Amino acid sequence: MSRVIHISSNEELDKHLQAERLVIDFSAAWCGPCRAISPVFEKLSNEFVTFTFVHVDIDKLSGHPIVKEIRSVPTFYFYRNGAKVSEF
């Protein structure tokens, strides 16, 4: 069972940005590499249970300021206590 939270609103994303340890998967339904990496992301969510794992479809949340930063998918952001610490 996956622990990945699928974000459906800007408010929900803002709430999760304050998590102690957060990993965000930015992707799109039309993106083949995104679909390929999804099972790995889900597996990692079960292995690293002290982290919050969320999935953001960039086409559904295109108005969020963080989503506007995304230039390619998949993109992963890592946050700790509300601050971005890394990305790839």
Curated annotation (Swiss-Prot):
A biological process term (GO) from this entry: cell redox homeostasis
Site feature location: Contributes to redox potential value: G32, P33
GO molecular function: protein disulfide isomerase activity; thioredoxin-disulfide reductase (NADPH) activity
Lineage: Eukaryota, Amoebozoa, Evosea, Eumycetozoa, Dictyostelia
Keyword Disulfide bond in record: yes
Residues of the active site: C31, C34
Annotated disulfide bonds: C31-C34
PANTHER family: THIOREDOXIN-LIKE PROTEIN 1
Sequence ranges assigned to domain Thioredoxin in this UniProt record: 2-88
Alphabetized UniProt keyword annotations: Disulfide bond, Electron transport, Redox-active center, Transport
Name by which UniProt lists this protein: Thioredoxin-2
Entry-linked Pfam families: Thioredoxin (PF00085)
Function: Participates in various redox reactions through the reversible oxidation of its active center dithiol to a disulfide and catalyzes dithiol-disulfide exchange reactions.
Record's keyword annotation contains Electron transport: yes
Marked site: Deprotonates C-terminal active site Cys: D25
Annotated organism of origin: Dictyostelium discoideum (Social amoeba)
InterPro entries according to UniProt: Thioredoxin, Thioredoxin-like_sf, Thioredoxin_CS, Thioredoxin_domain
Similarity comment: family membership: Belongs to the thioredoxin family.
